[in-house]
Amino acid sequence: MELGTLLAQPGLWTRDTSWALLYFLCYILPQTAPQVLRIGGIFETVENEPVNVEELAFKFAVTSINRNRTLMPNTTLTYDIQRINLFDSFEASRRACDQLALGVAALFGPSHSSSVSAVQSICNALEVPHIQTRWKHPSVDNKDLFYINLYPDYAAISRAILDLVLYYNWKTVTVVYEDSTGLIRLQELIKAPSRYNIKIKIRQLPSGNKDAKPLLKEMKKGKEFYVIFDCSHETAAEILKQILFMGMMTEYYHYFFTTLDLFALDLELYRYSGVNMTGFRLLNIDNPHVSSIIEKWSMERLQAPPRPETGLLDGMMTTEAALMYDAVYMVAIASHRASQLTVSSLQCHRHKPWRLGPRFMNLIKEARWDGLTGHITFNKTNGLRKDFDLDIISLKEEGTEKAAGEVSKHLYKVWKKIGIWNSNSGLNMTDSNKDKSSNITDSLANRTLIVTTILEEPYVMYRKSDKPLYGNDRFEGYCLDLLKELSNILGFIYDVKLVPDGKYGAQNDKGEWNGMVKELIDHRADLAVAPLTITYVREKVIDFSKPFMTLGISILYRKPNGTNPGVFSFLNPLSPDIWMYVLLACLGVSCVLFVIARFTPYEWYNPHPCNPDSDVVENNFTLLNSFWFGVGALMQQGSELMPKALSTRIVGGIWWFFTLIIISSYTANLAAFLTVERMESPIDSADDLAKQTKIEYGAVRDGSTMTFFKKSKISTYEKMWAFMSSRQQTALVRNSDEGIQRVLTTDYALLMESTSIEYVTQRNCNLTQIGGLIDSKGYGVGTPIGSPYRDKITIAILQLQEEGKLHMMKEKWWRGNGCPEEDNKEASALGVENIGGIFIVLAAGLVLSVFVAIGEFIYKSRKNNDIEQAFCFFYGLQCKQTHPTNSTSGTTLSTDLECGKLIREERGIRKQSSVHTV
């Protein structure tokens, strides 16, 4: 019998039948019929947007759950949606009470902090779960227990930003915030200067008109290249347009946006600008399941009526939509775990809480799920999300389209995932250096770079041509060839411009820079390809590549005139001191030989060997003979005197060894002094320059050489800088050409790089390099500080170095006509001017010998005459006493004959005795 028939017949209705019907309605029917679970959503509306994206995501999630019965097979999820005006907390409270009266298991929304607080207080009083998906201002004494928040904790995001700043090693950071809540969200970064060496400048975006151009102009003037924007994605889209308008969308700027919807913005206009743009992404698009849900969302949104312009890509799911989707799923998972979940109607004015509310709240906090925003778990104490991942994404020009859908294709094409930040483990950058350098042409291909340079032979010169030349064709030189090779490797296009002031770059007393360095600092040029020296002070304001040429400071001076050796050049092989020492040694050896020969008994001999009993002995080594022995050995001629004793032979042998070394050294050195024309320079090193003031010296004004002497702490170089600074008008020159002309025309020495000296001396034989290198340094390609091109330029330079192209380019531009080398001069025939002094010495010796012979003759004659007169007088007296004079002539004659005989006998005796020396 049907139930309708039973009810239609009153006679059949009994008391037992009534109890059976009541049992069926209360117990059997609920178990067989599907259960309905109602949730409530309160969403704020704004002008021109009656339905916000969170409401759409809320409905999308409920529809998805009801279609897929695997999660809630016996339960149908329904919803009640209430719309309120923005900032209307009273209306939010009233609508929340209306929904609680209907019997909802959980309340979602609203978004604004004041409205959230009002709804949260009601849910906390009636013990109904409140689900939040927006950033919430932290409360010091937060006692709310009946809520969860899927939005990442503000403190965790602040730590993530700080970790990224430390990873990029930013020393100066500009923080631009939209409202006061931004300072709370970035408090970890704002407190960083007290713990890290980071300078932070804080600026606020103008409110109301959204015109940030004056602010951006100040940032551009202040060279603020690392900027963190804390703003909504709508404001970010507008700011990016103004950044492009201000010319700040270049590779030297790095912008970081804290909004989690940066990936959803339409950035096609900025992809090829070279700008560095980084942000966080909460959506886990690497999961294929997530990608498919995003594609379904996109298809539904594209079929819907167009929405007002927000800067987002059409159909792109935002983070707030994904969080709302995940929030609905978290409630569904908790309700699935709850058995016989009965939702009762609650009245706000009665303050009677929901009996199952605490249990259901705990089930929600214990739920775990891998949603659109990654793995979701909650802190049971405060209801905040924990252990979440933030993808670190960076804007790129092109990439691999790994996803199947159009939206996912865009995400992979425009954005590159370079790392992950986890709330527990911190930062993990996955974009390794190997990946960065695998294709070094990515960010330089087909990009036009402004190159600043300076006219300096042979690096950059005007090309000689009969036709008018334009652009880069006007120049030639080593640096132009280097630029061409770098362009071939990296694929960039370049525009060469001469530095307006014609200077390399130096810092004045006010800290201001000039020259090419200033061009790079002001970002008027991308590269400085010139003979720009890598120095410490320049490295602090610009970046350099690895050096493409190594060199040092040296002295350029006029080549001294050659001087002939001179007629007495045979004395030059030995210094005057050595000549004096040799003569003293000869005298000393002669005296020692004389003394030893007198002292030793073996140098005395009997002059009459036939008469062994003779007491007369002789010694050949008189003082004159000893000197003659020394001179003969020194002249390599020997003498008739030979030592007999061992002691005298030792003296003679040592003297012979000494003369052997001296004569050999003299002979070996004599040829160079007689055959090679000597170049005598008044200076041989920097020390010689510092010790004198007659020769003026200096360097190029505002160049690295001048800076070297200005900053040097070495006493010699300090003295040289004092000399140059005291004569700045004459010592310092404007450029190298002016300095070279001064070297040629005046008594001036130019301090400059050795490579430039090498080039100049190859083409002007009147100039030469004096001394060695004062220091060691290198030329590098300059870039603005933080430029992404530096590492790529360095890799290309190393490649050219390994291939030998740098050496070939140097040989090409440095090879000149060449000057004859001094060492390669052929020995010419010796003339009178070379060895004429020897003839003078010979003639002087002959003349001297003649005069000495005459002197000896006169001396001997006078000596003999005196002796004869003395003898005659003495023996005349003797004869006169022995034989008195008679008057007869016979007696006188006899007496004279006898006296003459006596005199002759006495002469013979004295002559014989004079032969023997005792």
Swiss-Prot record:
The postsynaptic actions of Glu are mediated by a variety of receptors that are named according to their selective agonists. This receptor binds domoate > kainate > L-glutamate = quisqualate > CNQX = DNQX > AMPA > dihydrokainate > NMDA. The keyword Glycoprotein applies. Keywords: Cell membrane, Disulfide bond, Glycoprotein, Ion channel, Ion transport, Ligand-gated ion channel, Membrane, Phosphoprotein, Postsynaptic cell membrane, Receptor, Signal, Synapse, Transmembrane, Transmembrane helix, Transport. L-glutamate binds at residues 531, 533, 538, 704-705, 753. It catalyses: Ca(2+)(in) = Ca(2+)(out). Disulfide bonds join 765-819. Residues 1-30 form the signal peptide. InterPro entries: ANF_lig-bd_rcpt (IPR001828), Glu/Gly-bd (IPR019594), Iono_Glu_rcpt_met (IPR001508), Ionotropic_Glu_rcpt (IPR015683), Iontro_rcpt_C (IPR001320), Peripla_BP_I (IPR028082). Homotetramer or heterotetramer of pore-forming glutamate receptor subunits. Tetramers may be formed by the dimerization of dimers. Can form functional heteromeric receptors with GRIK4 and GRIK5. Interacts with KLHL17. Ionotropic glutamate receptor that functions as a cation-permeable ligand-gated ion channel, gated by L-glutamate and the glutamatergic agonist kainic acid. L-glutamate acts as an excitatory neurotransmitter at many synapses in the central nervous system. Binding of the excitatory neurotransmitter L-glutamate induces a conformation change, leading to the opening of the cation channel, and thereby converts the chemical signal to an electrical impulse. The receptor then desensitizes rapidly and enters a transient inactive state, characterized by the presence of bound agonist. Belongs to the glutamate-gated ion channel (TC 1.A.10.1) family. GRIK1 subfamily. The keyword Oxidoreductase does not apply. Pfam families: ANF_receptor (PF01094), Lig_chan (PF00060), Lig_chan-Glu_bd (PF10613). Residues 31-576, 675-834 are extracellular. It is found in: Cell membrane; Postsynaptic cell membrane. GO terms for cellular component: postsynaptic membrane. The lineage of its organism: Eukaryota, Metazoa, Chordata, Craniata, Vertebrata. Its main location: membrane. It is a multi-pass membrane protein. Residues 598-653, 856-918 are cytoplasmic. This is Glutamate receptor ionotropic, kainate 1. Glycans are attached at residues 68, 74, 276, 379, 428, 439, 446, 561, 766. The gene is GRIK1. The modification Phosphoserine is found at residue 725.
